[in-house]
Amino acid sequence: ERHRVPLPESMEYFGQNSGMIYYETKLEQIYDPRELRVANVHDTAYVYIDGEHKATIDRRDENKVKGYDTFKFDGCTDGCTIGVLVDAMGRVNYGEHLYDRKGIDAIRYGNQNLMGYDVVTLPLDNPEKIDFSLEGGKYPLFMRGHFKAQSQNDCFVHLDGFKKGCVYINGFNIGRYWEIGPQRALYIPGVLLKDENEIIILELEGCEKAEVEITAEPDLG
């Protein structure tokens, strides 16, 4: 769903509790080179200027200043678009981080709060709505393939060369993967399998080659 808000709001504000959320704001005039600061990222944010990836922000980064992550902005002479895609990676259910709202709180150009955001909520629970007729190329990217299964035995999909994302088998989200490990393969329950099967992968950061291997053996790292 799309929304228009004056300042960034959390996923929960829009009634979303998992998945991803995208914030976009437009700069309509000349902006000199300066630092851009993003406030309170929960959990991973991918920052784009006019569609080009410029920074990745992790909530675990230790070089924050009063909750802000900072990166260099080269400025613009005829306006530009700033986009921030935030990936919610789970919930902290104890201690000081119990109040764990997902998204960002603000984007600042120097000390100026940027105003006016188009927000798209992406719960990632409806892969059947993905339009694969659109031309891809840049990450994040949905990829689709098909495979045959001779039986409904449990198996594992190995994602060597992929970096970070999630996998759907016949429309069912079987889980997330991340190259930092330790897990190197995702479990596919046999009951999900048919004679002809569809696999969809959402890769957020890029992969060496768009190939996976499905075997009967796990890889626990």
Where do the language-model regions lie?
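Short, surface-exposed tryptophan/glycine-enriched loops
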Residues: G67-T81, F142-Q150, A185-E196
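Carbohydrate-binding surfaces of carbohydrate-active enzymes
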Residues: E1-R101, I107-Y109, L114-M115, P127-F132, ...
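Compositionally biased low-complexity segments at domain edges in trafficked proteins
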Residues: N111-Q150
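Terminal leader/tail segments of proteins
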Residues: F156, L186-G221
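Short clusters of small/polar residues that mark proteolytic maturation junctions
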Residues: D58, W178-E179
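Short, positively charged
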Residues: S18-I30, K138-Q152
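Aromatic-lined ligand-binding clefts that engage carbohydrates, nucleic acids, or primary amines
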Residues: P33-Y48, I82, F147-I169, Y177-W178, ...
